[in-house]
From Swiss-Prot:
Family of this protein: Belongs to the glycosyl hydrolase 5 (cellulase A) family.
Name of this protein: Probable glucan 1,3-beta-glucosidase A
Active site: E198, E296
Catalytic activity: Successive hydrolysis of beta-D-glucose units from the non-reducing ends of (1->3)-beta-D-glucans, releasing alpha-glucose
Broad class of where this protein is predominantly found: secreted
Keyword Secreted attributed: yes
Subunit structure, as described in the record: Monomer.
Length: 405
């Protein structure tokens, strides 16, 4: 039996820890992810996957279908053109201060017998140099682990979760160590490194073993930098559920916030979407005892984007995924520019973005997902900025005080 502790005492302790740890971060993180560049995702660049046929549903199967030579040629062209220094200049002009760059284990510590092609680290090197030139900071994000830590296509290979089986954790540590050695030593541009993106605890990842892995990654960070911040994804466990773990060690939590991946969310009113974002800030971010950022989030209010749930998989909004009841037809929400949405949809997207900015800046900031797509309304920051839907300056509000903080 544990003694009962008053809620007031718990809150007081939590707020003290929050104030103490939050003081270690000098400025708010206001960043954007470079998704779909060095780790492919079908919904961000559907053309790459359509050209490869139906069997190409993730980076693993894409490279497997194409073969080494053709895959290397196509991916090299993609890496050279999808993100360039001009993007970094535009990101800086928008008032952002961070870029989070996903990278897969296969780029840092490839495994024999797998079809992935390499060469990504040279482009990550370029990205760090471009960031430095434009006064941006970098979060290097280990986005995919051997066996897949979540079963999502953005881990490199969709399907069953196989991470923590066999020697996959040890292989992941090797990949992480390679990244830490390459990017943390003698560099003040890469100020954060993420241990692993979205390990899926509710999906079967063992949280105690995940904590052990996080401890191992911290040791690798400290071997290369006394000051770099280790970013820990919450594993889809409420962020404050990690309270008491690895406090006071330049460690920061990362939580991701989307309101489209559960069936009922696609039918929510804009008011309910806004309330959910505000509640995340008010209840969960404020309760964490370490600095915390929302490392992925979106302006999208539906899951209509083509391939968002996976290539060959349906959509909740239109009722083609599982037993979800249709909310309506996706229409212009599926692809193209945010400018193709109705006036009400554009206004609601702006409202939703502003509410999230307010909520997430209650703590240490945010990193929007993502900078660029081939046409995904609400997800593409470059498109949102060009159409006046993402605030400029970032503090501008057409819908102020939505959260009543």
């Amino acid at each position: 039996m544990f003694p009962r502790i008053s809620q007031a005492a718990i809150l007081a302790h939590s707020l003290l820890a929050v104030c103490t740890s939050a003081a270690t971060l000098a400025e708010k993180v206001r960043g954007v992810n470079l998704g779909g560049w060095l780790v492919l995702e079908p919904w961000i660049t559907p053309s790459l996957f359509d050209e490869a046929g139906d069997e190409a549903v993730d980076e693993y199967t894409l490279t497997e279908v194409l073969g080494v030579e053709e895959a290397a040629a196509r991916l090299s062209e993609h890496w050279n053109t999808f993100i360039t220094e001009e993007d970094f200049a535009l990101i800086a002009e928008a008032g952002l201060n961070y870029v989070r760059i996903p990278i897969g284990y296969w780029a840092a510590a490839p495994l024999d017998g797998e079809p992935y092609v390499s060469g990504q680290l040279e482009h990550l090197d370029n990205a760090v140099a471009w960031a430095r030139a434009h006064n941006l900071k970098v979060i290097v994000d280990l986005h995919g682990a051997p066996g897949s830590q979540n079963g999502f296509d953005n881990s490199g290979r969709r399907g069953p979760i196989g991470w923590q089986q066999g020697d996959t954790v040890e292989q992941t540590i090797l990949a992480f160590e390679t990244l830490a050695q390459r990017y943390l030593a003698d560099d003040d541009t890469v100020t954060m490194i993420e241990a692993l993106n979205e390990p899926h605890v509710p999906g079967g990842i063992n949280q105690d073993q995940l904590k052990d892995y996080y401890e191992e990654t911290l040791a690798r960070v400290r071997k290369n930098s006394p000051e770099a911040t280790l970013l820990l994804h919450d594993g889809f466990v409420q962020t404050e559920g990690w309270n008491g773990f690895m406090t006071g060690e330049n460690v920061m939590m990362d939580t991701h916030h989307y309101e489209v991946f559960e069936g009922g969310q696609n039918a929510w009113s804009i008011e309910k979407h806004i309330d959910a974002a505000c509640q995340l800030g008010r209840q969960h971010l404020q309760a964490a005892d370490k600095p915390v950022i929302v490392g992925e989030w979106t302006g999208a209010l539906s899951d209509c984007t083509r391939y968002l749930n996976g290539k060959g998989i349906g959509i909740r909004y239109d009722g083609t995924l599982g037993s979800n009841t249709a909310v309506g037809a996706c229409g212009s929400k599926s692809e193209g520019s945010v400018a193709g949405l109705s006036a009400d949809e554009i206004a609601n997207t702006r409202r939703f973005i502003e509410a999230q900015l307010d909520a997430f800046e209650l703590r240490n900031g945010w990193v929007f997902w993502t900078w660029k797509t081939e046409g995904a309304p609400g997800w593409d920051m470059q498109d949102l900025l060009a159409n006046g839907v993402f605030p400029q300056p970032l503090t501008d509000r057409e819908f102020p005080n939505q959260c009543n903080f």
